[in-house]
Amino acid sequence: MDLRQQRKRDHVRLAAAWQERRPPPAAAGPGAGWEDVHLVNHSLPELALAEIDLTTSVAGVRLAQPVVINAMTGGADDVTAINRDLAAVAADLGLAMAVGSQTAGLRDPAVADSYRVVRRVNPKGIVLANVGSDATPEQARAAVEMVEADLLQIHLNAPQELRMPEGDRDFRGRLEAIARMVEEAPVPVVVKECGFGVSRDVAVLLHQAGVRAVDVSGRGGTNFAWIEDRRAGLSDPDPGLQNWGIPTACALAEVAALGLPELDLIASGGIRHGSDAAKALALGARAAAVAGPVLLRQQREGARGVMAYLQQFLTDLRAAMLLAGAGSVAAMGQVPVVVTGFTGEWCRLRGVDLMALANRSER
């Protein structure tokens, strides 16, 4: 059996298993930080739930909803059904969707349909292609063409690669490779971490390279270090490496505080509910992305389960926005937000002005 295809199957199986671990094991470490982020109740919102405007944009591409079905899978025949189900739900709800890493499809045309199915099922939706940071401009263009993508997602995942027995060990030249893809890609580029968090320093480098959007993808969601340790059969994995990364709320807050012009932020990692997404919008994200909870429901209940979950997610997002007094995604970025606990301490030490966040007002 092809090693890459088997790895795809392993990732789906173990990602679903991770989501089912409630409460999470001690090795899971701290969460994404959303429990430390508090929206201030607005008792006189003067808003109607049906009129909450969820439209937003990322890198100049308009999104009907500020929620993205994030990259999960592709590259093996038996995961095609997963992408088919997710694409059908994305089409019905008007959600953008990213495919999983297309390296397998670029190397083996026989599995390319596991990605192409997304565009076939959702011909008018927003689709994100997906390549690694070591891809060439030619590979990036081919990935975009494969799914007729509107955006190109470039993923960063050094901690996962180092835990993977067959993973990369040399990460030199990645920023230069990203800059070349940005220059030559036919669509805007979104750079995405894979659950380990983008720091403000890396965000500056990506911005200087011309990247238009960053998915901070912090710790607190699916733990790919844990997944790779399970795949490798480690009996005593290093907890410091298995729990490596910046919690999502911390990463988002410190990157948003930079105020980098023309750099849109997406938040992912531990976003399980609509209120989590609302908190992400308040901290500066233009959209929130979800993967693990969606995959778990697809594995358990198929497209119907995914549809029910995401419908409730959007309903709860609208409710949280109304209760915070925000009638739009832009307005949500101006409501007061109080950050406490570990997340607050991280932000304070990293120079985020928490007093300004807590005392601002959209009105």
Curated annotation (Swiss-Prot):
State where Mg(2+) binds: E161
Role of this protein? Involved in the biosynthesis of isoprenoids. Catalyzes the 1,3-allylic rearrangement of the homoallylic substrate isopentenyl (IPP) to its allylic isomer, dimethylallyl diphosphate (DMAPP).
Q: What is this protein called?
A: Isopentenyl-diphosphate delta-isomerase
Q: Which UniProt key words apply to this protein? A: Cytoplasm, Flavoprotein, FMN, Isomerase, Isoprene biosynthesis, Magnesium, Metal-binding, NADP
Q: Which residues bind FMN?
A: A71, M72, T73, S101, N130, K192, S217, T222, G270, I271, R272, A291, G292
Write out the GO cellular component annotations: cytoplasm
Task: Kindly give the SUPFAM superfamilies that the UniProt entry links to this protein.
Answer: FMN-linked oxidoreductases
**The protein's assembly and partners:** Homooctamer. Dimer of tetramers.
What cofactor(s) does the depicted protein rely on? FMN; NADPH; Mg(2+)
* GN (gene name): fni
Xref: InterPro entries: Aldolase_TIM (IPR013785), FMN-dep_DH (IPR000262), IPdP_isomerase (IPR011179)
Q: Name one GO biological process term.
A: isoprenoid biosynthetic process
Indicate yes or no for the key word Ligase.
no
In this entry, which stretches build a coiled coil? none
Which organism does this sequence originate in? Symbiobacterium thermophilum (strain DSM 24528 / JCM 14929 / IAM 14863 / T)
Catalyzes what?
isopentenyl diphosphate = dimethylallyl diphosphate
Keyword Lyase in annotation: no
Which Gene Ontology terms cover its molecular function? FMN binding; isopentenyl-diphosphate delta-isomerase activity; magnesium ion binding; NADPH binding; oxidoreductase activity
Q: Which residues bind substrate?
A: R7, K8, Q160
What are the subcellular locations of this protein?
Answer: Cytoplasm
Query: Its domain of life?
Result: Bacteria
Q: What is its EC number?
A: 5.3.3.2
Q: What does the sequence similarity comment in the record state about its family?
A: Belongs to the IPP isomerase type 2 family.
